[in-house]
Amino acid sequence: MPNNVTVQELVDKVRLKVLQGEDYLQRKITTSDISRPALEFAGYFKHYPAARIQLLGITETSFAKDLTHEQREEYMTKMCMPQTPCFVISTNLPIPKELKKAAEDAKIPILGTHLTSSQILSNMTSYLLERLAPRKSLHGVLVDISGVGVLITGDSGVGKSETALELVRRGHRLIADDRVEVYARDEQTLVGTAPQILKHLMEIRGIGIIDVSTLYGTGAIMPSDQISLIVHLETWTPDVQFDRLGDRGDTQTIQGVIVPKVSVPVKTGRNLAIIIESAAMNYRAETMGYDATETFDRNLNQLIKQNSERDSKNNKGSAN
């Protein structure tokens, strides 16, 4: 996973215009934080975040106009540091001539957009947060089952890829097979994708490598998906106790995000695709407020109470 993004990539993804410095678009962006210079236009550079993208909007350029030419020249030269990746000017504003010269001397590109500062700030931050997030590679298969991202894990040879292939055949979509790159979009959202070299591919023992998009169409694949549920496949053994009521509430923490987890015993004759499909549908029902285990417990307690009351009445009748 790269820990930087080039200015060229930012231009392409966020649709920025290159106003100046086309030869310098390979400069590296190493942080998703974006600076809107304010104190710098007052001459205070003690804590200047030079490694960030510098965003100038109506407020910043208007304030700069009230400065003298010498002040603008001094401050904008100081803002053009070797580690500064680029400047972005919003709302189709003109480039201050002092910045134009300082950026050219420092070989820093200046980009522009018709969007407001708030809009372009949001767009750039969202892209950079996703691109620069620390990533972890997991062994497993990621499938989207009716809108629920399910990460299937388990020992090698337990049948993860074969089960995922059956799920794809049933109309669900593959994101990654064998290796899943995951990153935390925020504290509650874990996203998975496939390494570039493995996109759309699956390895099936006895057959080899297959291209899912070629065999089943582009509707059978997705580039990435939120991981909402982990299904861990375990070889069944008599001495291992598995959850039969679904009230255990197991979870697994990945990249700081807590994800619900269910363990499914693998045994000859079990249709794992249908079981995992049901697990995903059950998870979706729970997120909508329905809990089958809770309903079962409530109905069972009601039945026990009714039987107890009936037995109590029968005992009283016998006594009379």
From Swiss-Prot:
Keywords, in A-Z order? ATP-binding, Carbohydrate metabolism, Kinase, Magnesium, Metal-binding, Multifunctional enzyme, Nucleotide-binding, Serine/threonine-protein kinase, Transferase
Q: Name one Pfam family in it.
A: Hpr_kinase_N
Residues that coordinate or bind ATP: 154-161
Under the heading InterPro entries, the entry gives: HPr(Ser)_kin/Pase, Hpr_kin/Pase_C, Hpr_kin/Pase_Hpr_N, P-loop_NTPase, Ser_kin/Pase_Hpr-like_N_sf
Cofactors, names only: Mg(2+)
Q: Where is the signal peptide?
A: none
The domain comment in this protein's record states:
The Walker A ATP-binding motif also binds Pi and PPi.
Q: What's this protein's name?
A: HPr kinase/phosphorylase
